[in-house]
Amino acid sequence: MEKQELVKRYIETLISSPINLVGYDNFEEAYHFLYIDSTLPMKAEDLGQKFIDVGTGGGVPGVFLAIEFGASGFLIDSVCKKIEYVKNKCEELKIENLEFLCIRAEELKDKGPYREYFDSAVSRAVSKIATVLELTAPYVKVGGKILLYKGPGYTEELGQSVNAMKELGVKLSEVRKYTIKGKDRFLIVFEKFDKTPEKYPRKVGIPEKRPIR
Ligand SMILES: C[S@@+](CC[C@H](N)C(=O)[O-])C[C@H]1O[C@@H](n2cnc3c(N)ncnc32)[C@H](O)[C@@H]1O
C-alpha cells in the first residue's frame, strides 16, 4: 500500500478505536497532531536502522516513523491492551518493519539483547526529560540519538536534566522548533556519547518518582 494510504488507514484505526488511545476523534486534527507532529521534525538519518519508541501508546510516533522513513521500530508500552490493539492493526495493514512488546521500560534491561542495542530512541508525552532519558538511554548504542517530542515547557525540564545527562552518557545536540497549526513544538535531540552505567534504568517507578538530579 502507498505511504499516504497507510497513514490515512492507520489514523482511521486510531480515531475509531474502542479504547481511548490518542485523545482525538477527528481525522484532520489527528492527521496534524499525530502524523505531522511525529514526522515533520525528524530526518531519516536520525533514526538509523533500528529505533525504540518508549511509551508508544497508540503507536505514536513509532508507527508513523516506520511508515514514513522505513526504519525498523521496536514499540513498547506498559499497557498491554494498547500494544495488542496497535500490533493487530499494524498486522492487518501489513506494516512489516515493526515489533511490539508490552513491558515497562525499566524491565526491558532484563529481557533480551536490548541494552545499547538501538540506533535511536524516540518518546512522546511520556514523562519529564530526566525520567525519559533514564528510560531510553540504556537501550541506545554509543553514537546513537535520543529524540524527545516536547512542548514549550521543555526549557525548565532541560535545566533539571543536566546531571541526568552526565550520569547517563548523553549530551544535548540540537533543539528543532516547528509549528503544528499555530502551536510551538520542539524536538529535543540528544547524542549518546558514552556507555550508560548498568544500574540504569533503576527499578520500576523510580525514574519517575526520583529523577536523577
Ligand atoms: C500520554 S501516553 C503517550 C502515548 C504516545 N507516545 C503519544 O504520544 O500519543 C504515555 C504512554 O506511556 C506509557 N508509559 C508510561 N511510563 C512507561 C514506562 N515506564 N514504560 C513503558 N511505557 C510507559 C503509558 O502506558 C502511556 O501509554
Question: Where are the regions that the model predicts?
Answer:
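Helix-to-beta-strand junctions that scaffold the AdoMet/dcAdoMet cofactor pocket
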Residues: V140-V142
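A short SAM/SAH-binding and catalytic strip from SAM-dependent methyltransferases
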Residues: D119-T131, P138, P152
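Class I SAM-dependent transferase core
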Residues: M1-G48, I52, K81, K87-L98
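Conserved SAM/SAH-binding loop
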Residues: C102-K109
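Conserved SAM-binding motif I beta-strand of class I
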Residues: S72-D77
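Conserved SAM-binding loop of SAM-dependent methyltransferases across substrates and taxa
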Residues: G58-G70
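A short acidic, Gly/Pro-enriched loop at the edge of an enzyme's catalytic core
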Residues: K109-S120
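SAM/dcSAM-binding transferase cores
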Residues: Q160-R213
